Amino acid sequence: MKEFVIVTDTTTDLPREYVEKHHLYMMSLPYTLEGTSYTWENPMPVKEFYDKMRAGSLPTTSQANPEEAATLYESILKENDVDILHIAFSSGLSGSFNSCRIAAADVCEKYPDRRIVVVDSLAATLGQGLLVYKAVQLKEAGKNLDEIAVWLEENKYHLCLLY
C-alpha cells in the first residue's frame, strides 16, 4: 500500500496544532475583511473576525488557481514518494475544487507513478474540518487512500451546515 498525505484548505478552521500534529498540508485560501488581506500564515484573530462580522463587515475570499494548487502538489511530490488525498472546499462556494482538479491532472502527467485524488467536501469551516478529522482517523486506523476517498464521497452528504 502506497503512502499518502492529506491536503486540505485553510477554510477548514482546524487548529494549527492539529494540522501540525497530523502532518496535514494546507492550501491557503486568502480572505479580505475591511480592505485587509489575511492568510493561514497571517490570520486575523478569531474573536476579532467574528466581532467584525457581527458589526456588519463581510469577508470576501479568493479561490485557489490551478498554478497555486500545482505548486503545492509538486512541492509535496518532489520531497516525498507519496500519493495525495485533497479534501477540498465546497464547489458550491468556490471554484477552488475545480482548480485543484485541473492542477491534479497536470501534475499527474509529470508524475505518472503518483496519484492525486481531489474530493469535493461540499462543505466549509468545521464541516469540512470534520471530514478531514475523520480521514485522519481512518488513515491512522490503516485505511488506504481509496477506502478513505470512498468513505468521504458516501458520507459528505450526511453533514448539515448552517451558514
Residue ranges and their predicted role:
Residues 8, 88-90, 119-120:
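Short beta-strand segments
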Residues 2-3, 21-24, 111-115:
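A short helix-to-beta-strand connector/capping loop
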Residues 5-70:
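N-terminal glycine-rich anion-binding loop in soluble enzyme alpha/beta folds
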Residues 26, 86, 116-118:
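Conserved beta-strand scaffold positions in the cores of enzyme catalytic domains, especially
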